Amino acid sequence: STLSAISQTIKNGHQVLVFLNRRGFAPAIICHHCGWSAECHNCDSRLTVHRARNRLICHHCDYQQRVPHLCPGCQGQELISLGEGTERSEEYLEKCFPETKVVRVDRDSTRKKGAMQEVFEIGSSGEPCILIGTQMLAKGHHFATVTLVAVLDADSGLFSPDFRSHERLGQLLTQVAGRSGRGDLPGRVIIQTHQPQHPLLEILIGRGYSIFAQQIMAERKMTQLPPFRHMAVIRAESDRANEAETFLKAARKIAEGLNHPSPLIGYLGPLPAMLEKRAGRYRFVLQIDASKRSILQALLGSLIAELSQLKDSRRVRWSVDVDPQEM
């Protein structure tokens, strides 16, 4: 098991890196009796439990409130923190390994001046310890005696609607795995997943990142996604629920008028953004793709000029994202 591997690594006098890309204590708090859950008033998201600060915090807009003692819905006393964050994992590892130093590395634990330098000193000392952290721990750090990397909850990148999620997951797992065995000592990587037979995970683990990337490219070619089609996303947001969508409907109508229906240009949307409401603003997207970059650029050049003249353009905040890295 993962705990056994951690225990043996510590006994060997080496260091362990535990990776969990989710800060806080737990990603949700719910009532066992009525099902109430703490949600952000400004965003379409749940509030994350930060127990060390006794706060519920939105990781999108930074809205905060105290952790309630009673359920606001039914006044029940059984409020349950669901899921794992770095705080909770740190607490659990401290209980399992009371004689071993456990160091959490995330945006919350490194706020104070000098905190990150202290992490580097601990990691560089070579003394047995457990480093647990988010993505900020995965890149560019050389700790020679880290011989075990444990990745918790690798599944989150497998089921995202963003077509680039598999690519990012492969890059992240490769980066994290690269923290193990960087010195003269051999390294080991444990990946916790509910999908050990997932084809992409099997390729990444069994055949390496190069073959993994080739497989992703083959899938992109089959589904005609970038880089085999050229894409732009027009984003619009407004503090009124329907204005952003209305603006993008007009944008699509104008675009279709500029170019007669053609297999060379495709449209999707307008659709709600993955997080439709963020910081009190409603967000929609219109995706445009073309077989050639020159065709897409010509359309966008004319379309942007037309959109700037729309009256609705003053009531919404809009932008054009060419080759979007996030959907």
Annotated model-derived regions:
Residues 1-245, 249, 253, 257, ...:
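Inter-lobe coupling/hinge segments of SF2-like helicase ATPases
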Residues 253, 257-259, 264-278, 318-326:
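A carboxyl-terminal module marker
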Residues 252-261, 303-314:
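A common structural junction motif
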Residues 128, 289-308:
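Extended, charge-rich low-complexity interaction segments
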